[in-house]
Each structure stands twice: as C-alpha cells, then as structure tokens.
Amino acid sequence: MVLGSGAEQIFRNARCPVLTVGPNVPQPSSEVIEFKHIIFATDFSDGSLKALPYALSLAEENQASLTLLHVLPLVPMQQEIYLSGGTEKRLEALVPPDAKDWCQVSAVVSFEFPAEGILHLANIQSADLIVMGVHKHASRVAAHLPWAIAYEVVCHAPCPVLTVRG
C-alpha cells in the first residue's frame, strides 16, 4: 500500500466496516473464503471495542476460533506476569458467556510494538482474518505516519483485515 492510497483513505473514513486484502495475502485456493481463525486486536479504547461485535458475529457465523489480542509495551520481564494476568481477564470479560457454545475463544497478551505483535500472532496462528478498530479522530498527518498501527497491519498482514472506524 502506498502512502495516501485509496484503500487507506477508505478504511480511515468509511462509516461501515472495510475488508482490506493487502499485498501479502496469498491468492485463495478456492472460490469459497472461510474465516476459521479470527484475531480481534484491541487496545480497550471505545473505538477499538466497536470492532468486537463484528469479530464475534464472524466467529459465530463461520464456527471459527477467536483469539482476543492485546499488545502491551515492552516492560521488564518481572512485570510481564503481573500485567498479563489482569489483561487476560479483561480480554475474557469482553466475550459473552454463550460464546463458548459456538466458538473457541482464547486470550493472548503480548509485549511488543502493537503492529508487530498483531502481525506476529497472525503469522504464528495462520489467521484467516484480523479484526480491529481504527481511531476516527486521527489527524491526516498521523494517519499517514508509517508507524500508525492500522496502516502497518493492513500493509503487512498475511490475511485480510477488517477495520471498523471507532
């Protein structure tokens, strides 16, 4: 994706969810595309949580596994255990109790730069879809910075990315 591309303009400004298939997504082997493993990435902001109903709905519709992911900044190793436990509980609390009836849910906390953490998990788990919120109040300049999380994820993801403007 090039700076200021049409796809980026759309996912940043659209009032509906946008499914972006970036340059690193392989050609599907069949005409039917199934989302069997979905990653929902959140920073717990209101904007990112607006994408959660879409992740849950797609997981239910596709009988998919759903991984809830929160990426924390790098911290000393001693703090990781303390921080990850509470964060995992916050992630698990996002899922309705009946979700276990129709999908397999897991929570993952990682300590990396956000875009790298999302992409790393997508590669490790061979994700079929990443679902994430996009902050609607990002300035035009901030939206185009190469380290903007949604921009980096869409540009480098090994699978389609569903963005929901917050």
Where are the regions that the model predicts?
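Short, well-ordered secondary-structure micro-motifs
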Residues: M1, S30-E31, A51-L52, Q78-Y82, ...
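Gly/Ser-rich helix-loop-strand patches that form or flank binding pockets
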Residues: M1-Q27, H120-G166
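Hydrophobic alpha-helical membrane-association signature
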Residues: G6, A51, T87-L91, I149
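Small/aliphatic-rich secondary-structure junction motif
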Residues: I33-G85, V95-A99, Q104-V108, H156, ...
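Short, hinge-like loop/turn segments at secondary-structure boundaries
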Residues: H37, L83-T87, Q125, A148-A150
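Alpha-helical elements of Rossmann-like donor-binding domains used by nucleotide-donor carbohydrate transfer enzymes
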Residues: Y54, R90-A93, G117
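Charged docking surfaces used in two-component/phosphorelay signaling
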Residues: V109-G117
